[in-house]
């Protein structure tokens, strides 16, 4: 039976957290500056996390704290300190992969979600984790039919356990992220969140024959780089099996968080009101505006032993849209909802702009009205200050970006 599903969005800082909540996330997941799987993201100070939790709770939303790296003996005191802080800060759950950390979190009364790093691929393993966790984040390597079986068997065994699954974002070439390539090549530990992603580089594949000769099989291709996951075309099926939809992207910017959250929120709501299929093409087009390596459905409809869809020919970002910084807000007049923007790039009526700031989050606007010296203009030039009528509240110092489609 289809039920309302939670939408869980990523945040690498306060700007992303506020953006996610403003655009419809039910919950946000984030990390402190230690012991989480995105060590290279901005991440939160303790003070920022407290502020973010307050913002979420004031809006009846939740915050989940990632503490899901490999935990070594010398990490144990730090783990205890982080869990104590999480408890006092009133986080809504901790995302954990280490069993000892789960037990400690249980003793503190913290709600636990078993991380995707736990590699839960069957109902027996899920049932085991239900002793420690209220939710498991299922392995990305499962098919939709396998997930259905897991859910049915848990229900049959009367196991009270929520299931969370990824619906959008980057995929790892290794099983649930357990990769040693970054560590081997650069001494940067992927399983402690410090991956340098050598899989995203171009590689040369050479075959050595028995006679000692070499043959270049493939050169300058993205052999190890999977396409990004995008399940926007399968929301109704996924709502049948998951309690929570997770958007990957704790290393991504606020505009990515804004658009993915907005579209998946609208998609979920449209399934419930019956308008999903009418809006599907719009959803797909909007998701092409964010950074992507071309889209795929991951393992949901593919056997793990069959061929996979990799990036191969695509040079980095497959999106046809680019974000260009064009100015900053120097004043905002609340009564008339007009932002005064100092430009270092031309701006014209009909352009789509993004305005991003720590308190503002990320907002998108289509420019419909501009004035210079109280006179309407169609185009504002680089170096000018222009008043732009907006639908959102923005703030002095916010950065302004032009969203431009490339040919």
Curated annotation (Swiss-Prot):
Indicate yes or no for the key word Protease: yes
GO BP annotations, alphabetical order: biosynthetic process; proteolysis
Disulfide bond positions = none
Transmembrane stretches in the record are none
Its Enzyme Commission number?
A: 3.4.-.-
Entry annotated with the keyword 4Fe-4S? no
- What's the protein here called? Uncharacterized protease MJ0090
GO molecular function terms listed in the Swiss-Prot or TrEMBL record: peptidase activity
Q: Which SUPFAM superfamilies match?
A: Translation proteins
Question: Which superkingdom?
Answer: Archaea
Q: Which UniProt keywords apply?
A: Hydrolase, Protease
Family the UniProt entry places it in: Belongs to the peptidase U32 family.
């Amino acid at each position: 039976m289809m039920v309302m599903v939670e939408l869980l969005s990523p945040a690498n800082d306060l700007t992303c957290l506020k953006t996610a909540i403003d655009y419809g996330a039910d919950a946000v997941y984030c990390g402190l500056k230690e012991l989480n799987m995105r060590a290279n993201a901005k991440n939160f100070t303790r003070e920022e996390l407290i502020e973010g939790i307050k913002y979420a709770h004031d809006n009846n939303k939740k915050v989940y704290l990632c503490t899901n790296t490999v935990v070594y003996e010398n990490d144990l005191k730090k783990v205890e300190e982080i869990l104590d802080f999480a408890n006092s800060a009133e986080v809504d759950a901790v995302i954990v992969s280490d069993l000892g950390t789960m037990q400690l979190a249980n003793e503190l009364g913290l709600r636990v979600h078993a991380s995707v790093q736990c590699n839960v691929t069957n109902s027996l393993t899920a049932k085991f984790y239900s002793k420690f966790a209220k939710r498991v984040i299922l392995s990305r390597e499962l098919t939709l039919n396998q997930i259905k079986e897991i859910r049915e068997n848990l229900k049959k065994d009367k196991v009270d356990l929520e299931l969370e699954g990824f619906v959008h974002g980057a995929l790892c070439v290794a099983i649930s992220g357990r990769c040693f390539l970054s560590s081997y090549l650069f001494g940067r530990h992927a399983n402690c969140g410090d991956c340098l992603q050598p899989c995203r580089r171009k590689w040369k594949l050479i075959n050595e024959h028995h006679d000692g000769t070499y043959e270049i099989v493939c050169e300058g291709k993205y052999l190890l780089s999977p396409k990004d996951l995008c399940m926007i075309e399968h929301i109704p099926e996924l709502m049948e099996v998951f309690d929570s939809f997770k958007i990957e992207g704790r290393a991504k910017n606020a505009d990515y968080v804004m658009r993915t959250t907005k579209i998946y929120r609208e998609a979920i709501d449209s399934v419930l009101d019956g308008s999903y299929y009418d809006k599907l093409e719009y959803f797909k087009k909007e998701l092409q505006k964010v950074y992507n390596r071309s889209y795929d459905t991951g393992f949901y409809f593919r056997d793990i032993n069959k061929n996979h869809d990799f990036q191969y020919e695509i040079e980095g970002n497959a999106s046809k849209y680019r974000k260009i910084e064009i100015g900053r807000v120097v004043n905002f007049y609340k009564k008339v909802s007009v932002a005064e923007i100092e430009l270092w790039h031309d701006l014209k009526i009909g352009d789509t702009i993004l305005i991003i700031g720590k308190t503002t989050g990320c907002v998108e606007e289509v420019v419909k009205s501009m004035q210079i010296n109280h006179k309407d203009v169609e185009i504002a030039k680089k170096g000018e200050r222009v008043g732009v009528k907006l639908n959102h509240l923005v703030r002095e110092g916010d950065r302004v970006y032009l969203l431009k489609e490339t040919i």
